[in-house]
């Protein structure tokens, strides 16, 4: 038998791999930005850092996946937004350190290469990159029969951004008396889905629960993670924020303390948190303790900003959206996050 047939009999479709590359080119082209060098398909993606105009550049990187939210995308056969989730999880992390995203790379592993489905996945990645103003400069699609089932795939990404050395956000400027502002999340985002899947294990996804304001359950569960780059970057450039917390796995309790020193704490006014309907539904149908919800989910706030009191009005002026004044920084007595 020929080498091609031998490989095909092992479960690897080389021709399908070539087709995927051709299908995704138009999506990758959407993400072009100044600084990108070379073309898709090289051994390494290239970026000219001098094109950023940053005087003292510091590169900041982040990598992440989308957890078991991917299993719901597979279950509901909807693959066009999960890529945006992957980009969001990476770029929101680096924006929290003050970085402007520059470029992104993705990795998709699957049991069977289905070009149409993988095109949808990468189209979602490209949409996320457009929203983050990051170039998709490379990636890998690995067909791994025996490792994954034919319908299964996994997705991960890697983002690199740049910050002016003097504008890095490391929490050192956060102090007692600072105000905590919350930016709304789009939904669950990409964390806590092992619990979400357990709560709704017996649901088809087509249900319209009374708490979800007329939306089908599957649409709410797969709502893509919001990307905060365009909202946060102008604030960073004007040096209006002392700290930023991306509210991901571990909710408020684990993520908010990551932006300040150990002798400080965050006091949160629960009544001012814009809790989304899906979280009320999860608490009800999952019989989850109310306080535990804040240890798992973003509860409607995907990004938290620490600002000086005198900068609050300017921040609200720059942000073309509702901004929630949900708390303040206090001296730590016991817990790092106090929800009142």
UniProtKB/Swiss-Prot annotation:
List GO terms (cellular component aspect): cytosol
Any single GO BP term: 'de novo' IMP biosynthetic process
What EC number(s) does its UniProt record assign? 6.3.3.1
GO molecular function (one): phosphoribosylamine-glycine ligase activity
Where does this chain mainly localize? Answer: cytoplasm
- Please report which protein family the annotation says this sequence is part of: Belongs to the AIR synthase family.
Report what the protein is called. Answer: Phosphoribosylformylglycinamidine cyclo-ligase
UniProt organism field: Streptococcus agalactiae serotype V (strain ATCC BAA-611 / 2603 V/R)
